[in-house]
């Protein structure tokens, strides 16, 4: 159980992870998934309940305590150091040093290359992180987890900003970690991820534990019902809303280095979608429209 002022973020929940298992954690926004991860990684301390690893009770006062118990997390929003190299990001905090205290760069670059190649990825370890794609940055973070000998890896919405091809690459790496005996908590809103990778799935709703199922024994409709608390016959029912005149018109919107020649119009009563991968400029366009970016 975890409480914040005026909010119960976790209410007596339970979660069990087996060795070499991919266990999906699902629920709507606000269900308590992120709070549980922060408790497991030592960011928050629970008010009630216990955490056990291999049957032994542990108490995490901070993230170092969690890491010392072979737990690593890979978050949806990258936590890398963008202007440091791949090698520096992998080994930051546990660099190889000479007796004089100098960093053994050649040894670390070689080890980083070895880690990346073990995951089937040919990334130059001397490359700055800012020059990598989102998918490549996640692979570097997975390499960092492997380098720390993590036996429990938490992946928080790892496919949210990835293309179909990049998702397939992440699936391959995740399955490889599982085959090596690593236990993985996989958080995702995407049913495809869960049915493709997970052995079991646990659902939280309104900060409470709802249930745990073998993935091959729960249907998509049953899973959605567990998440929302009711039978869902239609996820997005169409409503007859008259579409009116143009409410917003954008023509040739340009901001050097961010976006170029963006044009569209939005009509009254219309839901207008603006989509693209991370870095495509979606947020910047909206900031430009709102006057936050000139």
Regions found by a protein language model. Name each.
Residues 1-294:
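Glycine-rich phosphate-binding loops of nucleotide-dependent enzymes
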């Amino acid at each position: 159980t975890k409480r914040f002022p005026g909010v119960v973020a976790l209410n007596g929940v339970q979660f069990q992870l087996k060795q070499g298992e991919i266990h999906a954690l699902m629920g709507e926004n606000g269900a308590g998934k992120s709070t549980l991860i922060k408790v497991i990684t030592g960011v928050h301390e629970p008010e009630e309940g216990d955490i056990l690893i291999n049957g032994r009770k542990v108490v995490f006062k901070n993230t170092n305590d969690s890491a010392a118990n072979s737990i690593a997390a890979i978050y949806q929003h990258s936590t890398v150091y963008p202007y440091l190299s791949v090698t520096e990001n992998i080994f930051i905090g546990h660099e190889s040093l000479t007796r004089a205290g100098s960093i053994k760069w050649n040894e670390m670059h070689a080890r980083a290359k070895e880690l990346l190649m073990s995951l089937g990825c040919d990334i130059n370890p001397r490359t700055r992180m800012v020059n990598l794609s989102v998918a490549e940055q996640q692979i570097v973070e997975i390499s960092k987890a492997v380098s720390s000998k993590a036996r429990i890896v938490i992946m928080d919405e790892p496919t949210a900003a990835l293309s179909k091809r990049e998702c397939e690459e992440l699936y391959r790496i995740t399955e490889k970690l599982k085959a090596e005996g690593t236990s993985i908590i996989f958080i995702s809103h995407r049913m495809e991820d869960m049915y493709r990778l997970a052995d079991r799935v646990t659902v939280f709703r309104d900060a409470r534990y709802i249930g745990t199922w073998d993935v091959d024994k729960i249907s998509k409709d049953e899973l959605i019902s567990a998440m929302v608390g009711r039978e869902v016959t239609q996820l997005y029912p169409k409503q007859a809303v008259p579409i009116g005149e143009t409410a917003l018109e954008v023509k040739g919107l340009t901001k050097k280095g961010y976006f170029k020649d963006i044009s569209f119009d939005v009509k009254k009563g219309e839901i207008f979608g603006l989509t693209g991968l991370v870095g495509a400029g979606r947020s910047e366009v909206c900031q430009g429209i709102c006057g936050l970016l000139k």
